[in-house]
C-alpha cells in the first residue's frame, strides 16, 4: 500500500471541494484542519482550482490536498505542478493514468463496471473511485464488484452523506469516502468556516463509531483480585452456591462462567481487571493509541501464530485495569 493509500485509510473521508474564489482556499484549509480532517480534493470544475491547490500545498504542508474531476492530461499536469499529492478522475482515461504514473503521483479513477475495473487492474491500479456512488447502486453494487475483485479498495463518492457514511465505512473493501457534504457552497460563499469545522467533527464521530463497531468491542470477563488461592476458591464456591455457576480452575484463577474470573493473587488493577474483546486486538490497540491512550507493552501476550492475544492499558478505570483480548 502506498503512502497516499495509507493516508486515505487513516483519514477515512476526503472532503470534495468546489471553489469559485481562490482566496477561499486558505480559510477553508484552516477550517478543515481545525475540524480534524486535514485533506481536500479540489475539483477542476472551476478556473481557480490550480491556484487553490497551490495555495493550500504551499501554505499548509500538513494538508493532504489533491485534484478532482481531472478530465485530461493537461489538467493533471497543471494540478501536479500546483502541488497536488493525488489525482482523482470521474472515469478511467488511460492517457491520464499513465501520465500520473510517470510523474509518480497516485491516481484514483472512477470505475463502476467490471470492464472498467479490469482495465484499471491491467494498468496496475487497485484503489479506485466508485462514482457516482449512490446513482450507480451504492454499497450493494460495491459488494457485488468486490466478489470477483477482492483486491480492489474503493473510494465511493457522489451521494455519500453523514447519514450513510457509517454504512459505507463498515464494508472492509471501502478504503475511504469522498464527501462533498462537508464543504457546502453556501458556507464557503458566506465565510461560514465554523459550520465546515463542525461538519468535520461530526464526521469524525461517525468514523470513530464505525471503527469501534468493526472491532466489535465487548466485555469478555471481569477479574476480581483475591489475596491467595484459598480465598479465591471460597469466592468461586460461594458463587456456585448462590447462582449455580460452576467453577473452572486455571493455574492463576477460577472462572465462574466465562464472564467472572476470581484471581488466586492480587493481580493487575487495584480491584481487578476487565477484559475487552476485539476482533483484531492489534488493530484495536493501534486505533486507541492514535486517540492518545497508552498501553503497557510489557504485558503483551501473543498467540502461537504471532497475533496479539492481550495487552493492558496503562490507565486504570474505577480501580480496574483494562486489557484488550483477541476474540
Model-derived features with residue positions:
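Conserved N-terminal beta1-alpha1 strand-loop-helix module at the mouth
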Residues: 1-74, 78-82, 102, 162, ...
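N-terminal beta-strand motif that seeds the catalytic metal site of vicinal oxygen chelate
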Residues: 4-18, 208-236, 269-276
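Catalytic beta/alpha-barrel core
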Residues: 16-18, 39-46, 63-71, 84-92, ...
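Catalytic cores of alpha/beta
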Residues: 28, 72-82, 115-123, 160-176
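Core segments of cupin and vicinal oxygen chelate
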Residues: 28-30, 45-47, 217, 223-261, ...
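Glycine-enriched alpha-helix->loop->beta-strand junction motifs that scaffold or abut catalytic
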Residues: 33-38, 59-63, 81-87, 102-108, ...
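Glycine-rich phosphate-binding active-site loops on the catalytic face of alpha/beta enzymes
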Residues: 90-96, 129-139, 173-195
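Vicinal oxygen chelate
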Residues: 213-215, 259-264, 289-327
Amino acid at each position: 500500500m502506498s503512502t497516499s493509500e495509507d493516508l486515505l485509510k487513516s483519514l477515512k473521508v476526503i472532503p470534495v471541494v468546489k471553489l469559485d474564489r481562490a482566496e477561499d482556499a486558505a480559510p477553508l484549509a484552516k477550517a478543515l484542519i481545525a475540524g480534524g480532517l486535514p485533506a481536500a480534493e479540489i475539483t477542476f470544475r472551476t478556473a481557480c482550482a490550480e491556484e487553490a491547490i497551490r495555495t493550500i500545498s504551499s501554505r499548509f504542508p500538513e494538508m493532504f490536498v489533491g485534484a478532482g474531476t481531472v478530465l485530461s492530461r493537461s489538467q493533471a499536469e497543471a494540478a501536479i505542478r500546483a502541488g497536488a499529492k493525488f489525482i482523482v478522475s470521474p472515469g478511467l482515461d488511460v492517457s491520464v493514468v499513465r501520465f500520473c504514473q510517470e510523474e509518480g503521483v497516485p491516481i484514483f479513477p472512477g470505475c463502476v463496471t467490471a470492464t472498467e475495473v479490469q482495465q484499471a487492474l491491467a494498468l496496475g491500479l487497485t484503489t479506485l473511485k466508485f462514482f457516482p456512488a449512490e446513482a450507480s447502486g451504492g454499497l450493494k453494487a460495491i459488494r457485488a464488484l468486490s466478489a470477483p475483485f477482492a483486491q480492489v479498495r474503493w473510494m465511493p463518492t457522489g451521494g455519500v452523506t453523514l447519514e450513510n457514511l457509517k454504512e459505507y465505512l463498515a464494508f472492509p473493501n471501502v478504503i475511504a469516502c469522498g464527501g462533498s457534504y462537508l464543504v457546502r457552497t453556501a458556507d464557503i460563499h458566506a465565510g461560514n468556516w465554523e459550520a465546515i469545522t463542525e461538519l468535520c467533527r461530526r464526521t469524525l464521530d461517525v468514523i470513530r463509531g464505525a471503527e469501534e463497531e468493526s472491532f466489535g468491542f465487548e466485555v469478555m470477563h471481569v477479574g476480581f483480585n483475591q489475596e491467595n488461592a484459598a480465598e479465591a476458591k471460597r469466592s468461586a464456591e460461594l458463587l456456585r452456591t448462590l447462582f449455580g455457576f460452576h467453577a473452572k480452575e486455571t493455574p492463576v484463577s477460577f472462572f465462574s462462567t466465562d464472564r467472572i474470573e476470581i484471581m488466586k493473587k492480587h493481580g493487575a488493577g487495584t480491584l481487578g481487571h476487565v477484559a475487552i474483546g476485539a476482533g483484531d486486538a492489534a488493530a484495536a490497540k493501534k486505533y486507541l493509541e492514535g486517540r492518545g491512550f497508552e498501553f503497557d507493552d510489557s504485558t503483551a501476550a501473543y498467540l502461537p501464530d504471532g497475533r496479539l492475544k492481550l495487552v493492558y492499558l496503562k490507565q486504570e478505570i474505577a480501580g480496574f485495569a483494562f486489557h484488550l483480548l483477541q476474540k
